[in-house]
């Protein structure tokens, strides 16, 4: 299952992107920003050489969370809810990619905006697709 998100920033920049893929399983998209054309884009992470869908550049950066994720059986322990580990309420979207055997995580708020270069980009889920 996939989700469509609206990326929006206080500078006025808005762009729709996707996370996940449809029933066919032939693609799995995740939000990235392009440093060449300064835009938000959905990139198919299953492709060997992912590129910006706007300009074709390979100079793209993922919004994937780089955090210390914990197994479900220990994540509820008080010690592990402290800093350096993400909490479930900090997660905007989690989506499992079967082809890569990996969960892609997008955290809530304060992402890098490719237009104003501030960490003020937010994502809002607009709809689900399959």
Q: Where in the sequence are the language-model features?
A:
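Residues immediately within or flanking Cys/His clusters that coordinate Zn2+
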Residues: 3-8, 28-31, 49-52, 110
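Glycine-rich, aromatic-bearing surface loops/beta-hairpins
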Residues: 112-130
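Short, extreme N-terminal segment that most often corresponds to the first beta-strand
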Residues: 1-19
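Terminal leader/tail segments of proteins
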Residues: 60-63, 74-76, 87-91
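Short linker/helix segments within small regulatory modules
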Residues: 21-29, 46-47, 67-68, 80-81, ...
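Short cysteine-rich clusters marking metal-coordination/redox-active sites
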Residues: 8-11, 34-37, 52-55, 97-98, ...
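Short functional micro-motifs and their immediate structural scaffolds
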Residues: 14-17, 39-42, 59-61, 103-105, ...
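Structured domain cores in non-transmembrane regions
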Residues: 26, 30-50, 57-67
